[in-house]
Swiss-Prot record:
GO terms for molecular function: ATP binding; proton-transporting ATP synthase activity, rotational mechanism. GO terms for biological process: proton motive force-driven ATP synthesis. It is found in: Cell membrane. It comes from Chloroflexus aurantiacus (strain ATCC 29366 / DSM 635 / J-10-fl). This is ATP synthase epsilon chain. Residues 89-110 are annotated as: Disordered. It is a peripheral membrane protein. SUPFAM superfamilies: Epsilon subunit of F1F0-ATP synthase C-terminal domain (SSF46604), Epsilon subunit of F1F0-ATP synthase N-terminal domain (SSF51344). Gene3D superfamilies: F0F1 ATP synthase delta/epsilon subunit, N-terminal (2.60.15.10). The lineage of its organism: Bacteria, Bacillati, Chloroflexota, Chloroflexia, Chloroflexales.
Length: 139
């Protein structure tokens, strides 16, 4: 019996489908969600969001947000989400370099925090894109 997953951003619905498992990066560490999971509300951290359906793993890069888990339904309200195969690795690398430069030049704690958050987001995007590229080569 699958669990229904909805991934939503402010712009659009990214995914609405029945899946077998969800593995998400939360404030308290990675959480694996299977059908009939206990109710849970948690904060998502930037990281790799994995969706398993019919034995196939689909990785996403998530920049943060919230996840509500009910026994037969999971809703993810994400700041940003990208499928691994949608990430432009060259643009992500350029954005990472720009975030590192902003971090070095930060004059205030606020600027430093913003630059570090952007850097974490771009590092996640790069890691997810690179893992997807390796998986494609192995197939």
């Amino acid at each position: 019996m699958p669990i229904h997953l909805e991934i939503v951003t402010a712009e659009r619905v990214i995914l609405s489908d029945d899946v077998d498992m969800i593995s998400a990066p939360t404030k308290d560490g990675r959480v694996g969600i299977l059908p009939r999971h206990a109710p849970l509300m948690t904060i998502l951290e930037p990281g790799e969001l994995d969706i398993i359906k019919n034995g196939e793993r689909t990785p996403f890069a998530v920049s943060g947000g919230f996840m509500e888990v009910l026994p037969h339904r999971v809703t993810i309200l994400a700041d940003t989400v990208e499928r691994a195969d949608e990430i432009d690795e060259a643009r992500a690398e350029q954005a990472r370099a720009e975030a590192e430069a902003r971090r070095r030049e930060a004059q205030s704690e606020r600027d430093m925090a913003l630059a570090e958050a952007k850097l974490r987001k771009e590092m996640v995007r790069l890691r997810v894109a690179q893992l997807h590229k390796i998986k494609r080569r192995q197939s």
